[in-house]
Amino acid sequence: DGDSLSVTNLEASNGELISNDDGTWTLTPSQDFNGDISLNYLVSDSNGGTVQANQLISITPVNDDPVVSGRVNLGSINEGNELIITSDQLLSKASDIDNENLYVNNLRVVRGQGNITDNGDGTYTFNPNQDWNGQVRLAYDIEDSNGGSVGVRAKLSVDPVNDDPELTGNKASLDEGVEDTSYIIRSSDLLIGFSDIDGDSLSVTNLEASNGELI
């Protein structure tokens, strides 16, 4: 009949439709949706005739980056000990909406003193520097199989342990004594050459002599 046609009652099977009031609509699919969206609508003419119609819009999937829900806590070790870290631990706060496999890459120390060794079997070894204790922060990337990635942080603590005193210099040479004469021995002389890496005060105990009486 040559009547003018118009579209009314436009509905989408997914997402949000907004009329732009100029003969166009904006369709915003739901977050992370991909697949077909069905459009149902009425085609009307200027004389009241209508017909139901439909169309399909295909939404192409795109890769979504992995996401993390927080910092990974790796616990604590004693000073001088090593820590074995597993990929499962490092991935424990990560997820991927596309259900892709996730991998750990570029694990490194960003705070604290120590080094990381990749054991090549999905585990890593952290070794703190000798005689060091404190807080450690690790950084790494979690990647999916399609190139998506996210940066992650992990923490652990290295707890102090007491270190034994060490002879780090030359021992004092004690003055010679005189026969049948008492000899004064000073703690300060016996401690010469010894040090303690923890900065603890040093004292002398269990002093024994190969001859004579000690008081």
Task: Locate each region found by the language model.
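Extracellular ectodomain surface segments
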Residues: 1-12, 30, 51, 56, ...
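Extracellular and select intracellular beta-sandwich modules with Ser/Thr-enriched
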Residues: 36-37, 49-55, 62, 135-136, ...
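Strand-loop-strand motifs at the edges of beta-sheets in extracellular beta-sandwich domains
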Residues: 9-31, 38-40, 108-130, 135-141, ...
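Short, solvent-exposed loop/turn segments at the edges of extracellular beta-sandwich modules
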Residues: 43-49, 142-148
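Calcium-coordinating acidic loop motifs
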Residues: 33, 46, 132, 145, ...
